[in-house]
């Protein structure tokens, strides 16, 4: 096919596409056969298509005609006679036999009689009387009253209430003194056992909580520069004492702080005991701190 034929083919395709777009309402009409003629013309044109450009136009035309054919198919009433509104209106008028009287009163009465006769005829086509569903809304309406339930305040028996522990300045001072006391005690133990395996030093095989506390107290020695971790030839961290730096050394930047985080989990705690075969704790087990209250009565 020559280039001129291709241009002509594309032109005919575009004309068909424009015709389909402009005549959508006419093409879906039941009495109109132009849609069939359009599809037939498109089939004839498709026999000359041999390039992607023309094939694209054919696909676009096919899509539009298929959409219109689907709409037209839904409008078809196969096996049903076509309902003619004009003929139906004409028959209604003949049945009613509209009055020709010039008197308004007489004319209104005759119209009412005619419509009553039509209503009786229509009632013969109904199998059941009209139900309430055809009416708008219920016959009666009762406003629902809102049921508001008041919640009563929960009253607890006085004998089961306990007074919370009241912390005052004296209690806080005592806790601070205990922390300082334990840090000094651990510092003396370190001086007596240094250099010592760091994990062996802080681990208490009889108490996991006190192992965590020992790690907490040793961190104060690191912070004050009184202890340091040194790796030995076997790669084990050894804990030993240090002389705290002076203020001049800190200001001059001669001291470099390295912050480490040790997550002492229960699994790690048990593995340390098993790995180093720890039987006794270097740091003695401390007595538990008991908290007592002066009264079991709630005041509020």
Curated annotation (Swiss-Prot):
Its main location: nucleus. It comes from the Eukaryota. GO terms for biological process: DNA repair; double-strand break repair via homologous recombination; meiotic cell cycle. Coiled coil: none annotated. The keyword Zinc does not apply. GO terms for cellular component: CENP-A containing chromatin; chromosome, subtelomeric region; nucleus; pericentric heterochromatin; rDNA heterochromatin; Smc5-Smc6 complex. Keywords: DNA damage, DNA recombination, DNA repair, Meiosis, Nucleus. It is found in: Nucleus. The keyword Flavoprotein does not apply. Two subcomplexes smc5-smc6-nse2 and nse1-nse3-nse4 exist. These subcomplexes are then brought together via a number of interactions, forming the Smc5-Smc6 complex. Acts in a DNA repair pathway for removal of UV-induced DNA damage that is distinct from classical nucleotide excision repair and in repair of ionizing radiation damage. Functions in homologous recombination repair of DNA double strand breaks and in recovery of stalled replication forks. Plays a critical role in meiosis. Belongs to the NSE4 family. This is Non-structural maintenance of chromosome element 4. It comes from Schizosaccharomyces pombe (strain 972 / ATCC 24843).
């Amino acid at each position: 096919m020559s280039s001129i034929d291709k241009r002509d083919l594309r032109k005919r395709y575009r004309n068909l596409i424009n015709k389909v777009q402009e005549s959508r309402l006419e093409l879906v009409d039941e009495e109109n056969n132009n849609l069939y003629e359009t599809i037939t013309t498109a089939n004839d044109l498709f026999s000359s298509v041999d390039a992607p450009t023309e094939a694209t136009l054919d696909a676009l035309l096919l899509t539009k005609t298929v959409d219109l054919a689907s709409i037209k198919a839904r409008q078809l009433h196969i096996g049903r006679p076509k309902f003619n509104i004009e003929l139906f209106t004409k028959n209604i008028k003949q049945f009613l036999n509209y009055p020709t009287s010039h008197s308004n009163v007489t004319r209104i009465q005759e119209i009412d009689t005619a419509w009553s006769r039509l209503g009786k005829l229509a009632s013969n086509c109904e199998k059941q009387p009209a139900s309430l569903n055809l009416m708008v809304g219920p016959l009666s309406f009762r406003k629902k009253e809102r049921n508001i339930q008041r919640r009563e305040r929960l009253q607890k028996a006085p004998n089961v209430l306990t007074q919370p522990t009241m912390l005052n300045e004296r209690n806080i001072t005592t806790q601070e003194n205990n922390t300082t006391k334990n840090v000094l005690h651990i510092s003396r133990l370190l001086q007596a056992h240094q250099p010592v395996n760091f994990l062996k030093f802080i681990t208490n095989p009889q108490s996991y909580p006190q192992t965590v506390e020992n790690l907490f107290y040793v961190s104060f020695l690191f912070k004050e520069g009184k202890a340091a971790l040194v790796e030995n030839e076997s790669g084990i961290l050894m804990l030993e004492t240090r002389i705290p730096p002076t203020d001049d050394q800190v200001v001059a930047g001669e001291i470099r702080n390295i912050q480490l985080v040790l997550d002492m989990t229960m699994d790690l705690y048990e593995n340390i005991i098993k790995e180093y075969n720890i039987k006794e704790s270097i740091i003695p087990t401390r007595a538990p701190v008991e908290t007592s209250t002066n009264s079991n009565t709630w005041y509020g």
